[in-house]
């Protein structure tokens, strides 16, 4: 969440010569192509944005390897998270319908009027905690803040607990979602920050 928001959005918008500025180009391509970004089908050696993204992920994995002897399960979890992020993110931009149905929070990140929301990629729960989830009518929204398909009885409990723990977050999310819908109707696009 933090890395996406700060390193890939805020920093490159302030410093256009940042290697992460290629992420802004990714946003533009996704927006112009109804979420599709063909760059994810290319070799990392032929596409600067893919090169930067994969290099950062490889560096994160390599850098965390030092923790392996003292925190093997944490390190394995980090490796899995990096792999899962790449797999889900790449697949979603090559198959927009998959993204719209399976990771609607990320689809909404690119396709809403304000791309400065919905920072999570693989699961939306942190967007709920940080009050940055915005729902749209253009995706099929998740039915619980974990973003998992849960049995109905469990989903009801998860939603009830989440709304009890995060009432202000849910109110803010609802207000932001309504504002975004109005901006979409008016054709307003908020610039990336």
Regions found by a protein language model. Give the residues of each.
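Membrane-embedded catalytic scaffold of the fatty acid hydroxylase/desaturase
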Residues: 1-166
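A membrane-cytosol interface segment of integral membrane proteins
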Residues: 155-191
């Amino acid at each position: 969440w933090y890395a996406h928001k700060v390193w890939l959005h805020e920093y490159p918008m302030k410093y256009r010569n940042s290697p992460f500025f290629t992420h802004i180009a990714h946003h533009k391509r996704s927006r112009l192509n109804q979420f599709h970004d063909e760059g994810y089908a290319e070799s990392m050696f032929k596409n600067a944005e893919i090169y930067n993204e994969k290099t950062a992920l490889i560096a994160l994995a390599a850098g965390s390897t030092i923790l392996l002897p003292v925190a093997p399960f944490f390190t394995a979890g980090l490796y899995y998270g990096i792999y899962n992020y790449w797999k889900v993110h790449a697949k979603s931009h090559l198959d927009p319908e998959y993204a719209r149905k399976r990771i609607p929070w990320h689809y909404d990140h690119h396709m809403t009027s304000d791309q400065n929301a919905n920072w999570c990629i693989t699961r939306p729960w942190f967007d709920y905690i940080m009050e940055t989830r915005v729902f749209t009518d253009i995706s099929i929204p998740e039915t619980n803040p974990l973003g998992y398909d849960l049995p109905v009885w469990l989903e009801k409990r998860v939603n009830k607990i989440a709304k009890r723990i995060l009432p202000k977050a849910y109110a803010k999310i609802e207000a932001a979602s309504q504002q975004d819908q109005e901006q979409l109707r008016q054709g307003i696009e908020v610039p990336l920050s």
